Amino acid sequence: MSISNLEGVETASPVATRQMRNAIVASLLGWSLDLFDLFILLYVAPVVGALFFPSSIPTLSLAAVYASFAVTLLMRPVGSAIFGHYADVHGRKNAMFVAIVGVGISTAAFGLLPTIAQAGYIAPVLFLILRLVQGIFVGGVVASTHTIGTEWAAPNRRGAMSGRVGGGGAGIGALMASFVFLVMSSLFPGDAFAVWGWRCMFFAGLLSSLLGWFIFNNLEESPFFKEQQKQKAAGTITATDKPVKKLFSSGWRNVLFLNLLITFGGGTGYYLTSGYLPSFLKVVNGVPNNVSSLILMGASVIAMVSAVFFGGLSDYIGRKKTFLLVGVCMAVLLPVCYLGMAKATDTSAITLYALAIAFLGNAGYAPILIFLNERFPTEIRASGTGLSWNIGFALGGMMPTFVSLASASPAQIPMSLSVFIVVIFVIYLIGAWLIPETKGDFR
């Protein structure tokens, strides 16, 4: 009997309320702090660009920073392969602990780096190397947090759990980064921010490492993984000890490919909305840091509402219909919002557009987490979910770089964004049309 035939896990391993709560909190905070660490770079991108990748053309400097962000994303599949393998073979909990602590330490290390004015061209090289290291740990966080939370969740609430962790966690991470950005902008106003403010923002990444101790001391292993190990020991099932290799076998390659159409669109939607808003507000709208941070905090709250709503909606109408609905809305409404926001001069109008963009952007990937978990059985779930998510989001994470490169000046950014969004969400809709409905298929 293969692990794909494993049934009755919920009844064989009753979910204790306290452990379910701990698992959900750990998954939510793990992903929140992971995104918090990544958002720090997005919020200080213009400053970091000038310090590590100086250029007389602002959009080129900005593109270089986003390229360094894409470097991290490219290493995330590697991290998913490493930590996903460990999570599938040895357990989710320890994989999650090591990955989250690693992200926190590597993020804080950015605050110690010398700038190009202090160390010459070794500075951007060190910056990129550290981004590579961080990417491996981030990939590990995805493979573990995106699995253990859904395996503890109640069957009829897995979609809401998906939105809460995947999108809500990202919203919390962005909210935390916005708050830290506001505090640091106040403590280090004007030119002082380019000296110490950005460094202190990176030091705040150590919050992730503190969460590691919560996980180590309060979280039990996933009931699905424990049941799998129990049945393996009894000889009633077999499970592969090479989950990554199995994912690329003929039986799973098509599943992985279709998943990528969804995760690529969801990742692009996220990085071209919540991820690009900080730079858009500064470079296109010219909003001051203190005002921008407040707008971004509001956008983060709206992003959480959107993610939980659309994740929960998928529990009622299914994952496939939710993807189709959101894809159409994104392709039509996001360009309208960005073009309108570029013309807005009133702070209230800019804020409303930013809130609408954040709402739409997080709707696009709210159900993705549970969709991916339902696509794979327990024996390869961490590896399959992690690789599907990280490869798609790695591709999506390159889009801000391409948007910046396609824009000769800040005035061209809104139209470039609109074109990229329409094209990519057509691809997303094709994927949504081709995938099967997965609601309730959890094994």
What are these regions (language model features)?
Residues A45-P77:
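Extracellular/periplasmic helix-loop-helix junction of adjacent transmembrane segments
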Residues G212-L219, F371, V422-R443:
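Multi-pass alpha-helical transporter architecture, strongest
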Residues G159-S185, S208, S388-P400:
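Glycine-rich segments within core transmembrane alpha-helices of 12-TM secondary carriers
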Residues V89-V101, Y316-V328:
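Cytoplasmic membrane-interface "Motif A"-like loop-to-helix N-cap segments
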Residues G79-G91, A307-R319:
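Helix-to-loop junctions at the C-terminal end of transmembrane segments
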Residues L42, W252-A303, G396-P400:
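Extracytoplasmic gate region of multi-pass secondary transporters
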Residues V101-G120, C329-A344:
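C-terminal ends and interior cores of transmembrane alpha-helices
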Residues G120-G139, S348-A363:
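Hydrophobic core of transmembrane alpha-helices in multi-pass small-molecule transporters
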